[in-house]
Amino acid sequence: MSEPLRIAITKGRLLDDSIRMFQKAGASCSELLDPGRRLVLDVPELGLSAVLAKAPDVVTYVEQGVCALGIVGKDTLMEVGGSFYEVLDLGYGRCRFALAAPRGFSLSARRGTLRIASKYPNVTRSFFRSLGQDVTVIKIEGSVELAPVLGLADAIVDIVETGNTLKANGLEIVSEVAPVSARLIVNTAAMKLRKSEILELTEKCRGVLNA
Amino acid sequence: MTIFKAASPEGTRDKLFAECLRLRGIRSSLMELFSSRSYKEIMTPELEYYDLFVRAENPLPQETMFKLVDRSGRLLVMRPDCTAPIARLVASHFKDAEGPFRLCYDETVFRSAAGLDGADSELPQCGVELIGAPGLRGDIEIVSLAVDAVRSAGLRDFRLELGHADFFFGLTEELGLSREDEEALRACIESRSFALLDELVAGYSGEAAQCLRRLPYLFGGPEILDEAAALTSNPRALAAVERLRDIWRELVSAGRGDCISFDLGLVQGLDYYTGVIFRCWTPGAPSSVLAGGRYDRLLCDFGLELAGAGFAVYVGALASCFECPEPEAAKTLIFYESGCLAEAVALLGGGAELSCFATEAESLEYARRAGMKLLVVSKNGIKEVDPNV
């Protein structure tokens, strides 16, 4: 038996969903459910050893090859980019990127350069580039909905799940930007050097997800 | 000013003794190998005109290039790639010559790293270009030299992966894809985005579409070639598979087949490559340590009807796979009386260094502290002094 494949999993909701998927695939996930002080958590049934990380770090770990695999949201992949294989849409962690603005806002009615606030400046830039519209992007670290309320920006680009937060702040969705869900990513060299193990795992996950 | 005193620019760093030894060792064994195969070294300028790298086929985004402005206001870049300058060199110096020529280089390319991800902006590369050898023999020479290159650098556990541009182009041509869709599809296969690929191909039916859907999985041992050949009847794609098989057979008979694998989904930089494409992977390196292929159109851009093929070894990535011990400190100190410099210098090498002190007593004291033995060279000859007595 070769050494386990190291996988980086995004902490939080994606971790819970990932544990559920692994359990359906036949793993007990006892270490993942109760990490204690351990930093590296084994999932022996699937030949994995997991580390938990913040989403952008998952991408860094996989790109640099210290983890062969990673589970991370498409939102992060779109924002930070990088070079890796994106082999599986895991289907969970579903939400979407949307452009939202105070009621009555219309993209075509405004003249002059729009100011758009977002936690995701790269996603925002490439969305407006695809529309052929030049905008000023303002990076905000949290509570992006505040920006139009305070008059800092005309509209925001953010992750939307239910839309309740938007509504509570008098905002509505102007345009969908992109759907988001969790992805399984693979380091390029690992894919080549450990093909059979990785494909076996992706097939297992695919089987569970389609069940 | 002072805040930058201790820092080097993002993506660059100082390299000290052990790392230098390791890099130097790899570079010299590669260059020795290339020269033994009749590849002649060339050097192109570190600085080039920006325009050289903004031809349509160049896959390098402009923000990755370091730019400068010369006296007359023209835009220059720090060489971001070796092949385009070499194409320029061939086009301007070998206009009327007939191929083949064999060229090799040991240079640094500069690419502005995105920052804070540990990537280097200065990338040492050693590589070869075989110009004017369009056929199978040219492919075989380049691929087998690539195997020998990583071996000569000391790598034992590695995989050289072969693909062919025409497999992908044969299929997309059959589907009649627009340039844009073709690029979207290529990006999908490059990043193995299986889900998105299914979506893109969904509108098409038939053999070529089926085969494209399967393309990201078409990597592995020689059995992949049989699988690929069974999936398509497109003549261009089949010819690509046969070419790979021919290369592989020759390498196997030359004892270089064990490390060869195939990836027909190897579609990076396809704008550049027109035939065989290859990359070398090894455990311990997060990305490939060598990349190359055939680019028969590149020289045409420079007005020369000549085929080209070559590869570059990413020396930095390769070096990171090896441990290298720190160079040893000198064990012997040599103090010489005035007039005996020549005799003292003759004793250097093998871990000896000259004493910088003016007297034998000071030299002795230094040797004691540094744990060295002392040789005293005088007109009467050489005597060894044990500093601990």
Segments (PLM) and residue ranges:
Chain B
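Beta-rich nucleic-acid/ligand-interaction surfaces
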Residues: 44-62, 163-173, 266-274, 362-365
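Hydrophobic mid-domain F-helix/FG-region of cytochrome P450s
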Residues: 145-152, 166-176
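Short, basic, helix/turn surface patches
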Residues: 67-78, 187-190, 378-389
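TRNA-binding/sensing appendages of the translation machinery
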Residues: 1-84, 140, 161
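Extended alpha-helical scaffolds
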Residues: 152-160, 165-168, 181, 195
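Positively charged, Gly/Ser-enriched RNA/tRNA-binding surfaces
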Residues: 19-37, 48-49, 83-95, 103-155, ...
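Acidic, His- and aromatic-enriched active-site or binding-groove loops in soluble protein domains
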Residues: 64-70, 176-199, 256
